[in-house]
């Protein structure tokens, strides 16, 4: 992971989660794992509780949206659901515009779908891939059966969540 600066002297990491608070932008790049999900959750909460607003021509005050860019090969299910649940809560108060870039695979698909309806986009060359839940369990038959049962539950949760979006 390397830190870089752009011409506006904004520091960002080349892998992981990037937050540009003034622009209300979050980027999730790389695996959906504990570190990246924690950073994304903190960024979402920060932008949610420090939400900007603007006044329209008719005097209506509206919350500024959060832009959430996703490029991931997937990752951990628990962390995906943590981000997904938070995104659903946040979007009740302000729109979340999701943008799929590069590749959006596995756990990233649900995060892309968690954006506000009508505010989800993918790049022209973005690849989307969804697959059944994978397990890497080995050991006793009892252990394998428990893992298989859990995988079925998680898979059903994910497909139900996607259908709800």
What are these regions (language model features)?
Residues 1-165:
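Terminal-region recognition feature
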